A protein has these predicted regions:
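Short beta-strand edge/turn micro-motifs at domain boundaries
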Residues: 3, 121, 144-176, 184
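A hydrophobic membrane-anchoring alpha-helix module
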Residues: 181-241
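Short, surface-exposed coil-to-beta transition loops
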Residues: 104-106, 140-145
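Short, low-complexity N-terminal intrinsically disordered segments enriched in polar/charged residues
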Residues: 2-3, 7-60, 68, 241
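A solvent-exposed, acidic/Ser-Thr-rich amphipathic alpha-helical stretch
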Residues: 63-129
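Charge-dense, low-complexity intrinsically disordered segments
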Residues: 37, 41, 79, 136
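Short, cysteine-centered beta-strand-loop-beta hairpins and adjacent loop/turn segments enriched
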Residues: 127-137, 168-170
């Protein structure tokens, strides 16, 4: 029995040494694994580039290239706007020309990929400057972009962008000025973006009042939509509610 085992071991080693089937099979498996890892890395790099380009193109007013980060049916949801990415670009462009001052900053990302779908969460802050109760103010809101993405014809793009609004603050640009807010107006809005909403409502924007915060039912519902997207569920109106 021992002799048979030794003989089999020698044959196996010889086959490996000569590049026989066992070695070739391992090489094929390794190549497939390496290929999948490379594809996954390239997908993540492409998605992160989309997230970064969104901010740079929007803040620079580069609307032609801004459109390139979206798929044709791309939809944008923010405190002050819910609609197609084309409408968002047009209204943002018009606002910039009238002096609306909004800039965005990015932090780290986490990206979940399932086949040709992905969900990307990215830490961000929104800074908007405008007069509030007669005082020029800056509002800074921190949160996360929550992007639903798809790969179509080999190209990743945003299908839906939603946001988590985690906390915000308001400060007079001139610290020597004092600011008094109407507490009744302030409490109409969720704590995660109540100062941003106060400012935007004062500018005449209709502000959505159920955007997700750091925690709570609205946040959990959005996480659930992310899981549904990765599970290949169709995107219906519940994703935009």
């Amino acid at each position: 029995m021992a002799k048979k085992l030794t003989l089999m071991s020698k044959k196996s080693s010889l086959a490996d040494a000569r590049g026989g089937p066992p070695l070739r099979a391992r090489k094929v498996a390794l190549a497939k694994t390496s290929g999948r890892m490379l594809d996954g890395l390239l997908d993540r790099l492409a998605i992160r580039e989309i997230v970064e380009n969104w901010v740079l193109y929007r803040d620079a007013g580069d609307w032609e290239r801004f459109r390139s980060v979206w798929h044709e049916d791309g939809y944008m949801m923010a405190t002050w706007f819910q609609g197609s990415h084309e409408e968002f670009a047009a209204i943002s462009k018009a606002g910039m020309e009238k002096g609306v001052n909004i800039v965005n900053f990015l932090g780290g990302s986490t990206i979940d990929i399932a086949g040709n779908r992905a969900v990307a969460q990215t830490k961000m802050s929104i800074s908007q400057r405008a007069p509030v109760e007669g005082v020029m103010c800056d509002v800074v809101c921190v949160g996360r972009f929550y992007d639903f993405l798809a790969k179509r014809k080999g190209k990743w793009g945003i299908v839906l962008r939603r946001l988590f609004y985690e906390k915000d603050r308001i400060d007079p640009v001139d610290p020597s000025q004092s600011l008094k807010l109407d507490p009744e107006v302030l409490k109409r809005y969720p704590v995660g973006y109540q100062h941003l909403a106060y400012l935007q409502a004062g500018l005449g924007f209709p502000v959505k009042t159920n955007m997700p915060g750091l925690r709570g039912p609205d946040a959990e519902r959005l996480y659930g939509l992310g899981r549904a997207w990765l599970a290949n569920k169709p995107m219906d109106e519940t994703f935009r509610a």
